[in-house]
C-alpha cells in the first residue's frame, strides 16, 4: 500500500484521543480511540478509512483529518481497543466483505441482536459530540 509513516519528535508528541469518523464503510459514524506517535501520509490510489468529524481526534497526521487507509479490501485504522464491538455496522461490513471475497456469492449475514453494541456506540457518539 502506497503510504508513509514518519515519527517526528518524542513520545510526548503522541496523538491520543477519542474520535468520531465518517466512513464510506459504515452507515453510522464510527467511534474510536487513537494513541499513536506516527504521522501517516497516504499515497496515490489509497483512500482514507474515514474522516475525523468530532472536535476531538487527530487522524493520521494531525493535518488533514483523514484517518486510516483503504486499498482494495484492506482496511487500516489507528482506532483500536473496542473499535469493532462499538461499531457493529462496520463489523458486519468487514465480515461480509471477507466472506464475499472467500466464497463467491456468500449468503448475507443473519442479523444479530446488536442492542448493547448500538447503545455503546450511541453513548460514545453523543459524549464526543457534546464534550469535544
Regions found by a protein language model. Give the residues of each.
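Short, flexible turn/loop "capping" segments at secondary-structure junctions
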Residues: 68-72
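Acyltransferase
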Residues: 73-132
Amino acid at each position: 500500500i502506497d503510504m508513509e509513516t514518519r515519527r517526528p519528535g518524542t513520545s510526548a508528541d503522541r496523538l491520543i484521543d477519542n474520535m468520531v469518523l465518517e466512513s464510506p464503510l459504515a452507515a453510522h459514524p464510527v467511534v474510536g480511540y487513537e494513541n499513536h506517535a506516527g504521522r501517516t501520509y497516504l499515497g496515490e490510489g489509497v483512500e482514507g478509512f474515514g474522516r475525523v468529524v468530532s472536535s476531538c481526534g487527530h487522524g493520521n497526521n494531525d493535518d488533514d483529518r483523514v484517518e486510516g487507509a483503504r486499498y482494495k479490501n484492506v482496511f487500516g485504522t489507528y482506532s483500536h481497543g473496542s473499535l469493532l464491538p462499538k461499531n457493529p455496522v462496520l463489523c458486519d461490513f468487514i465480515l461480509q466483505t471477507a466472506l464475499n471475497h472467500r466464497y463467491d456469492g456468500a449468503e448475507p449475514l443473519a442479523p444479530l441482536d446488536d442492542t448493547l453494541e448500538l447503545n455503546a456506540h450511541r453513548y460514545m457518539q453523543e459524549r464526543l459530540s457534546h464534550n469535544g
